[in-house]
């Protein structure tokens, strides 16, 4: 099959439009009935979501990414599972011109734990320009869905539990630079989703 690309320059180009846990959810969980801490709680939800995605290696809510590679391998693994869709694959040809690979010329595996892309049957990746970095760009959408309900309940519960823990111990927390230890309940909830490289 040839080589597999598992590393490259990954950039999130379109961020999620919602959080996996709503403000009303976390306020109910923490028994908060005022609005004084709303902005602070939203920051904690973001921090807890980032912790979940870092721990598991997964993307919770739909986001768009670009992965840049120095050439076409036999197969391209797309990080931040689950893979939702591949938007486009572009490359710099041997003449230095940007081109787009036809969707008919590659196949997408979004059923595997880590999404993959490879040439369609009896098709080949095109030649790229030598001596130039980042000649291939794969644009794709990752995440369980566009709504919180599409995210597995264990992941959402862990986000809620961690945000609540941070709120209850706010004197030790600086949003954006959280040093708090991940609670065991979060580890237990998230561990089945943790990506493990073999």
Question: Could you say what each language-model-derived stretch is?
Answer:
Residues 1-198:
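Divalent metal-cofactor coordination and adjacent catalytic microenvironments
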């Amino acid at each position: 099959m040839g080589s597999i690309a598992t590393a490259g320059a990954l950039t999130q180009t379109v961020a999620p439009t919602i959080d996996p846990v709503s403000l009303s959810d976390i306020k109910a969980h923490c028994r908060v009935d005022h609005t004084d801490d709303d902005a602070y709680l939203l920051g904690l939800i973001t921090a807890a979501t980032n912790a979940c995605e870092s721990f598991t290696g997964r993307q919770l809510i739909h986001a768009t990414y670009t992965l840049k590679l120095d050439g076409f391998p036999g197969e391209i693994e797309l990080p931040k599972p689950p893979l939702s869709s591949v938007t486009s694959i572009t490359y710099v040809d041997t003449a230095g011109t940007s081109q787009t690979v036809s969707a008919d010329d590659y196949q997408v595996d979004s059923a595997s734990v880590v999404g993959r892309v490879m040439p369609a049957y009896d098709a080949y990746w095109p030649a790229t320009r030598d001596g130039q970095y980042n000649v291939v760009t794969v644009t794709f959408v990752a995440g369980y869905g566009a709504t919180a309900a599409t995210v597995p309940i264990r992941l959402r519960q862990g986000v809620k539990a961690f945000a609540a823990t941070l709120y209850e111990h706010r004197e030790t927390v600086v949003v954006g630079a959280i040093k708090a230890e991940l609670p065991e309940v979060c580890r237990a909830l998230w561990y089945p989703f943790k990506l493990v490289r073999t």
